[in-house]
């Protein structure tokens, strides 16, 4: 039991000594908060896109190449 007490006291002393070196000074944070601004034309088009804006992509077939394999694997 005596060894256990010594180890705990050494760990507490080490934490106390290390806390003096590790602590940092906190700085104030300034937020840019001001009065609410009235926007004449809201820009809702970027926030919620319409379904008409979607672009349809052409999907290429995944079948074999009819003209042959231009770069066949190397045989060793």
Swiss-Prot record:
One of its GO terms (biological process) is cell-cell signaling involved in cell fate commitment. This is CLAVATA3/ESR (CLE)-related protein 46. Residues 1-26 form the signal peptide. The keyword Secreted applies. The modification Hydroxyproline is found at residues 61, 64. Residues 53-76 are annotated as: Disordered. Keywords: Developmental protein, Differentiation, Glycoprotein, Hydroxylation, Secreted, Signal. Belongs to the CLV3/ESR signal peptide family. It comes from Arabidopsis thaliana. The keyword Ribosomal protein does not apply. GO terms for cellular component: extracellular region.
